[in-house]
């Protein structure tokens, strides 16, 4: 067999393997979960080793995106030293490790192989839509693919799933062959977008269609007809059912919507934190620390703006490098039209959501970049080099598999196993703390968590309760005030504080300690002032979102405080 034919056959094999990888990864929750990222990292390491072995070399091009990725990974690796939660911060490195490995993989591929990957996006999106939409009629499966009646697909999150479907439309619009088949695919993807109820993606879809109509003249009429047909079908659905929460949700688009006001509230709260912490709070630091700076009612893991998210995670420098790399590619004249459109869609939506936490979307982002840019360094596949590479890759894969097992145990609610395998995994430790059977066990678990993270109200609550059971009411007050600082908008925290103080006051009364009883009575009377202080710091935006602050004591509590104020403890 001729050498050229053998080489072509080899290229076809690894091209098909990579296409299968790219096709299937979105089915694993879009690679959102950390355990999925760990498994993906192992698969990418194997693919890289296979390619390097076939090509007898490793090609690395130092460009702006590689620099930004290395800075991001370095940031996630270093932030545990000063992070809000050192144990969770380390997971950020493994969460985004597949992104760097995928970019390295693209550097080993030829232009033809990379081009073929674009069509995998719509095929994957169409398949996911066709498989997940019918589950609305299968009650046992509905919760896995729908949330609040909105299609979340295999991503289990409607907005980012809708973005992925929109990304599938763009390569189909640029196809010159099989146009009828491509239009049918676009119709399925459009239907999927409407089923997600994502208003932002709907607006973005209209903009992309207008862009396509201006640049793809042959598709102008078919695209407009498809969009009009889908909108008409959605309007008919709303007219018949009266339901505007799913397919017809785009009819509720408003600049005053609770969702948009909530996003603005997140940004308003996090910007001072970013300015104050130029090196970030670490992965998940924003989530755990938000009680200390929030000015409204919300509990969100992500800022819903990826640049702000990276900035609060790892600081200014990696974020600016990453933003510059994307902006440079977006504005470059040599950027092909399809890649520019894909990049624009991802960047635009990522400014209002946490799309890049789904590594499948991160991978599409990398497809729009130029892996052949920059100075090339070729690492030859020699015996000493091979041994070093295999040992390094093997060690990294082993760590990823171990962490992946621990994180998967946590995902499956086997928290005892997750905490044994990775003691610094805070979510599982919190579950075990809540399930503690004795004060001693609760205190030990709380102390373990506090060594890494001092920003969780539940941990301080546990410490306060243990102190109360031991009769150490002064320490109880200190711990409970820490809990209030971590969850200032949780009215239940103030009510719990009320009950503990009342218990302390009544205990002191029974023991004949009038002075101490008066002290706890005074602190009881301070609770409305604590609530008023939180009201004073509350942003006007907080009153424009669905979950508004509840900072008034129930009537029976207020009545008790009124009676206490007129008693001997005044």
Residue ranges and their predicted role:
Residues 80-83, 126-163, 191-194, 244-257, ...:
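Membrane-interfacial helix-loop-helix modules of multi-pass inner-membrane proteins that assemble, modify
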Residues 313, 322-417:
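Long, contiguous interaction/recruitment modules in multidomain scaffold/adaptor proteins
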Residues 262-300, 314-320:
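TM-adjacent membrane-interface loops and short helices in multi-pass inner/ER membrane proteins
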Residues 150-154, 208-209, 234-268, 289, ...:
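Flexible juxtamembrane loops connecting transmembrane helices in multi-pass membrane enzymes
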Residues 1-78, 84-122, 175-181, 210-225, ...:
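Transmembrane signal-anchor hairpin modules in multi-pass inner-membrane enzymes, especially those
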Residues 15-28, 39-50, 73-78, 93-105, ...:
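Alpha-helical transmembrane segments of multi-pass inner-membrane proteins
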């Amino acid at each position: 067999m001729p050498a050229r034919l053998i080489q072509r056959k080899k290229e076809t094999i690894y091209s098909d393997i990579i296409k299968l990888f790219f096709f299937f990864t979105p089915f694993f929750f879009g690679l959102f979960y950390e355990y999925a990222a760990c498994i993906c990292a192992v698969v990418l390491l194997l693919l890289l080793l296979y390619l390097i072995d076939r090509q007898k070399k490793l090609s690395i091009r130092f460009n702006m995106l590689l620099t930004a990725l290395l800075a991001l990974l370095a940031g996630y690796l270093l932030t545990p030293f000063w992070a809000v939660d050192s144990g969770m911060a380390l997971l950020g490195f493994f969460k985004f490790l597949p992104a760097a490995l995928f970019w390295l993989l693209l550097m080993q591929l030829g232009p033809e192989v990379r081009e073929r990957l674009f069509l995998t996006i719509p095929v994957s999106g169409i398949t996911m839509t066709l498989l997940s939409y019918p589950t609305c009629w299968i009650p046992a499966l509905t919760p896995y693919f729908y949330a609040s009646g909105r299609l979340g697909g295999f991503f289990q999150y409607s907005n980012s799933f809708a973005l992925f479907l929109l990304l599938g439309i763009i390569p189909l619009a640029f196809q010159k062959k099989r146009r009828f088949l491509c239009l049918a695919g676009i119709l399925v993807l459009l239907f999927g977008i409407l089923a997600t109820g994502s208003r932002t993606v709907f607006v973005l879809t209209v903009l992309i269609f207008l862009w396509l109509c201006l640049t793809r003249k042959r598709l102008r009429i078919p695209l407009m007809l498809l969009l009009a047909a889908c909108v008409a079908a959605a309007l008919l659905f709303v007219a018949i059912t009266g339901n505007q929460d799913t397919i017809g949700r785009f009819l509720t688009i408003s600049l005053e919507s609770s969702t948009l006001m909530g996003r603005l509230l997140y940004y308003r709260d996090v910007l001072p934190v970013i300015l104050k912490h130029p090196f970030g709070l670490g992965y998940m630091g924003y989530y755990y620390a938000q009680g200390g700076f929030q000015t409204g009612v919300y509990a969100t893991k992500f800022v819903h703006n990826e640049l702000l998210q990276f900035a609060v995670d790892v600081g200014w420098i990696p974020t600016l490098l990453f933003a510059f790399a994307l902006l440079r590619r977006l504005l470059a004249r040599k950027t092909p039209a399809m890649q520019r459109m894909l990049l624009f869609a991802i960047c635009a939506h990522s400014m209002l959501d946490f799309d890049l936490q789904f590594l499948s979307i991160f991978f599409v982002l990398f497809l729009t970049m130029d892996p052949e840019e920059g100075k090339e360094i070729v690492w030859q596949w020699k015996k000493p080099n091979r041994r070093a590479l295999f040992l390094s890759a093997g060690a990294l894969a082993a760590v990823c598999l171990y962490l992946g097992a621990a994180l998967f145990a946590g995902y499956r609610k086997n928290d005892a196993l997750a905490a044994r395998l990775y003691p610094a995994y805070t979510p599982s430790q919190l579950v075990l703390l809540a399930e503690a059977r004795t004060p001693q066990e609760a205190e030990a678990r709380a102390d373990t968590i506090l060594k890494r993270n001092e920003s969780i109200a539940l941990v301080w609550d546990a410490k306060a309760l243990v102190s109360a059971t031991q009769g150490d009411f002064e320490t109880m007050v200190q711990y409970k005030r820490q809990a209030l600082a971590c969850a200032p908008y949780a009215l239940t925290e103030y009510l719990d504080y009320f009950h503990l103080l009342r218990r302390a006051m009544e205990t002191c009364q029974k023991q004949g300690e009038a002075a101490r009883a008066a002290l706890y009575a005074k602190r009881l009377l301070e609770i409305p002032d604590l609530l008023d202080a939180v009201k004073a710091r509350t942003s006007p935006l907080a009153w424009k979102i669905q979950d508004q602050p509840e900072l008034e004591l129930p009537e029976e509590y207020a009545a008790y405080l009124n009676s206490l104020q007129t008693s001997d403890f005044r």
